[in-house]
Amino acid sequence: MTDENIRQIAFYGKGGIGKSTTSQNTLAAMAEMGQRIMIVGCDPKADSTRLMLHSKAQTTVLHLAAERGAVEDLELHEVMLTGFRGVKCVESGGPEPGVGCAGRGIITAINFLEENGAYQDLDFVSYDVLGDVVCGGFAMPIREGKAQEIYIVTSGEMMAMYAANNIARGILKYAHSGGVRLGGLICNSRKVDREDELIMNLAERLNTQMIHFVPRDNIVQHAELRRMTVNEYAPDSNQGQEYRALAKKIINNDKLTIPTPMEMDELEALLIEYGLLDDDTKHSEIIGKPAEATK
């Protein structure tokens, strides 16, 4: 069973946006502040806990279950490891590429953890979820009411914003039935022009906040190469302070909202306003016409 006092959060975002890196650095800072945390990796790459564990990839629930024959044959200590500052780490895993549903690993892992008492003596459970909300399996932490606070990692790049809007749409779908809410956008900077202003504008349109702007800093990559969080690798760095600031904001966050996703033309108008997308009027002679008609 799950303690009702636990705050269950999830980090979503476009693939490659730096979601796992951002979440682990932020959760490490939260652990430094005395929060008791468990990370449940919901990505078949199983990279949601590697900075916490100083490892390439943790053995996943699905992988071990396949070896043993059934998830019921596993022991909790085999799949839940302890990392930096006592953070508990689990990776759900997924099937071989092209075979089966990766969302099944999330469902199997969470059920196993609940049935074996993993959710006891915790302040936060964090789900690190693959990419966009592309299927019901990956939306499972939202759909089943597991994750109550969603943080979307995005940037001022066009596809990251498209993904953020789609994720907001997924949250809205389950907000009334499951009680899930959007906690805010985390801008993981790509040094796009007017990036902070753009993401604040996007957040306002989505009825949420830009909870923090994480500047780009090479020290993040230096720490990653050593399989460490910034907080452990360079605790006195400016970037470490940024993650601590974000951690504090999440701990104290009470602005949990039902998002208002944008229609595609509204989102594209925002992108045009900030110069990320060409104005279609410049190409009106070909827009909307069959390809053969524009040769």
UniProtKB/Swiss-Prot annotation:
Q: What is its EC number?
A: 1.18.6.1
**Stored SUPFAM superfamilies:** P-loop containing nucleoside triphosphate hydrolases
Post-translational modification summary for this protein: The reversible ADP-ribosylation of Arg-104 inactivates the nitrogenase reductase and regulates nitrogenase activity.
- Binding-site positions, [4Fe-4S] cluster: C101, C135
Its biological purpose: The key enzymatic reactions in nitrogen fixation are catalyzed by the nitrogenase complex, which has 2 components: the iron protein and the molybdenum-iron protein.
Q: CDD domains of this UniProt entry?
A: NifH
Return the cofactor note field. Binds 1 [4Fe-4S] cluster per dimer.
Chain positions found as ADP-ribosylarginine = R104
Q: Which family does it belong to?
A: Belongs to the NifH/BchL/ChlL family.
Per its UniProt record, the required cofactor names are: [4Fe-4S] cluster
Which named protein is this? Nitrogenase iron protein 1
Please give one Gene Ontology molecular function term for this protein. metal ion binding
Q: Which organism's genome codes for this protein?
A: Nostoc sp. (strain PCC 7120 / SAG 25.82 / UTEX 2576)
On whether Oxidoreductase is a keyword of this UniProt record, the answer is yes
Q: How does it assemble?
A: Homodimer.
Please tell me where ATP binds in this chain: G13, K14, G15, G16, I17, G18, K19, S20
Which superkingdom, per the lineage? Bacteria
Q: Which reaction does it catalyse?
A: N2 + 8 reduced [2Fe-2S]-[ferredoxin] + 16 ATP + 16 H2O = H2 + 8 oxidized [2Fe-2S]-[ferredoxin] + 2 NH4(+) + 16 ADP + 16 phosphate + 6 H(+)
Write out the entry's keywords from A to Z. 4Fe-4S, ADP-ribosylation, ATP-binding, Iron, Iron-sulfur, Metal-binding, Nitrogen fixation, Nucleotide-binding, Oxidoreductase
Against PANTHER family, the record matches this protein to:
LIGHT-INDEPENDENT PROTOCHLOROPHYLLIDE REDUCTASE IRON-SULFUR ATP-BINDING PROTEIN (PTHR42864:SF2)
Q: Which GO terms describe its biological process?
A: nitrogen fixation
